Amino acid sequence: MSTNSSKATSEPFLLGGDLPVNRLGYGAMHLTGYGMWGPPADERNAIQVLRHAVYELGINFIDTADSYGPGDNEEMIRKALYPYPKDLVICTKGGMLRSGKLDWIHDAPGAPYIQPLGDPRYLRQQVELSLRRLGVDCIALYQLHSIDPNVPLADSLGELARLQEQGKIRHLGLSNQPGVSVAQLVEAQKTARIVAIENLYNVADRADDEVLEHATRNHIAFIPWFPLGHGGLVGPDSALTPIAEKYAITPSQLALAWLLHRSPALLLIPGTTSVTHLKENASAAHVILNPAEVRAIADAVDRAGLPSWRPVRDAQVQTATTVR
């Protein structure tokens, strides 16, 4: 292991074949209020984090969604960065309703819920709203946030493809809870060209290895959410800690570096509200691992048996008629 840049970690990914993006991006979800609801408590800090990411660290890929806030996250990005640098790629998502704070925690007693909504009319409305909030004429990457089991996927993606033809979307992607399957991706490609997917994936949860291999072979960006796991992966008792200490880096940096080496299709979006942690995460791009070290890190995590936070695919989806 060394801490110099290498082609494996520094070469940009060509999103859609024409948008070069640095593979260590930024996930803006946490720049909202408590429970990802409303504006951030410290707007000045949120602006500082975004500006430092883009102007100081050279991050040129930012991930957001209309459901973060809802809407506040997109507006914060515009407030901090508009007019945007020419090379900045903003990915936003639509097609998910939220009922309140902390509604991603499905097993919390009495918790609010998330609700996929793939109705074409709703998606068109949400694209128009995202364009307005972000202050752009065309969204570089727009992802269907969650697949609606009550609406044919071809109908949802078909409407987004029409918006793409109208010049309002440049590239299309697909996300789901907890992730897009190979079968869903193949089905989606019959309707629209999908250049990115966003799935749960990290060194402790590699259940979607098959999806990652498919994405890599087909030059599709694989954007892993929860790249640092759900706490246990990077905590003081993590299996990564002794390995990271040996090389004078943090467990977070090691976990991110592992992903950068796992596949050239992985496009990372670690999120933070701290400039200090932002710098720490960005430094992971300079950590070089050889193939033996990549295998050893995965083996160490497997032996530790770290628990994964992985909801059963589509198990928590409620029908659209429950929304009020």
What are the residue ranges of the model-derived segments?
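N-terminal binding-site loop/beta-alpha segment at the start of enzyme catalytic domains
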Residues: 1-92, 323-324
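Beta/alpha (TIM)-barrel catalytic core signal, keyed to glycine-rich beta->alpha loops juxtaposed to Asp/Glu
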Residues: 3, 12, 147-324
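Short, well-ordered coil/turn segments that N-cap beta-strands
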Residues: 19-24, 57-60, 84-88, 136-140, ...
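Active-site mouth loops of central-metabolism enzymes
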Residues: 31-44, 108-121, 145
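Short, acidic/polar
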Residues: 40-53, 116-133, 180-185
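A short, structured active-site edge motif that brings together acidic residues
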Residues: 87-99, 199
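Short, flexible, mixed-charge acidic loops at enzyme active sites
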Residues: 97, 101-108
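Active-site groove signature of glycoside hydrolases
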Residues: 131-149
